[in-house]
Amino acid sequence: KLLRMNQLDKFKKFIEDRNENVKVGLVGAGQMGQGIIAQVSRMYGVELVCIIDRNQKQLEIAANRYKKLKNNSLLCSDSITALDNVELDILIEATGTPSAGALVAKNVLNRGINLILLNVETEATIGLALRKEAEKNGAIVTVADGDEPVAALDLYNFATELSFEVISIGKGKNNPFNRFATPSSLKKEASLKKMNPKMLTSFVDGTKTMVEMTALANFLDFNIDVDGMHGIEATYENINQYYIPKKDGGLLDNSQVVDFAFGIAPGVFAVIYSEDEYVNYEMEYLKMGEGPYWTLARPYHLTSLEIPRTIRHIMLEKYSKLSAQSWNVEVVAYAKQDIEPGTNLGSI
């Protein structure tokens, strides 16, 4: 009898052999946290045991959402010190704030608890240090499925497994670009979208894109072609004409770079290359366009809704999906207005 053994089946067997649920904690009960709660509550063999958030209203909404779906005890707190007394297999950090992410990481990695970051801001800031701390304590730290870095990484893995060379890789810019956007200017739009104005600002002003591509580059040991990246207008059909070497009519002085493009949101892309004549014939026959540069694409990423994949991966495969292995790229701040000495910069 043939057995179908996908990740769901493997995880079910893992739980049956373990005879104990995987215990998960969550820090950050905002928009992303609510999606995590909805998904974790539907996972076989996974139990959410604590939710931490400084916002009491969000904390209450999150707790009520989970308790409606699962009838187990749940610790709720507005302080990360509550984690000290909780037994966990995995902690999911979903605040989107580097300072909070760093404090949470210190708390759990020192105890050998695995850490999933739906907080790529922390990864882009101290990712290499987090990886070293995790390895020292026998834990795993990884960026979550659902964010563009891991979605793009799936394309990279697919391409390299087929012996293609990845020339460039990146994401689509989702929101209209306004480098001068602020939380106050986006307050109304954020309210309509049920988002934190600071988070929406990071999408609109380009911060999120820079942070995400930094995380991807530092894992793959890639770089950027120019400061700030090119960020061109492109489509899935023609991006392989631009993000290729200049000698072949493209924009790039370098290969193995990360970048982004307007016009392909909310997906990710990889421009790949083969020097083999027959491979290129096959790719053209398979209606992949004209080579020798080809585009692989995934036209979506499902943010917090993909968290079950990361949980299962950590418990079954026991290695990080994406965590800095080099430090080639960093993100720096760029002023949106003239700033007088002594001005409180706020956060974005």
Where are these regions (language model features)?
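Rossmann-like NAD(P)H-binding beta-loop-alpha module
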Residues: 134-135, 142-208
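Short gly/pro/ser/thr-enriched loop/turn and capping motifs at secondary-structure boundaries
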Residues: 57-59, 122-127, 131, 148-152, ...
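Rossmann-fold NAD(P)-binding glycine/threonine-rich loop
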Residues: 100-107, 119-139, 144-147
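A short hydrophobic/small-residue beta-strand
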Residues: 114-116
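Conserved N-terminal Rossmann-fold NAD(P) cofactor-binding segment
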Residues: 55-86
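C-terminal catalytic/substrate-binding lobe primarily of soluble NAD(P)-dependent oxidoreductases
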Residues: 3-15, 188-348
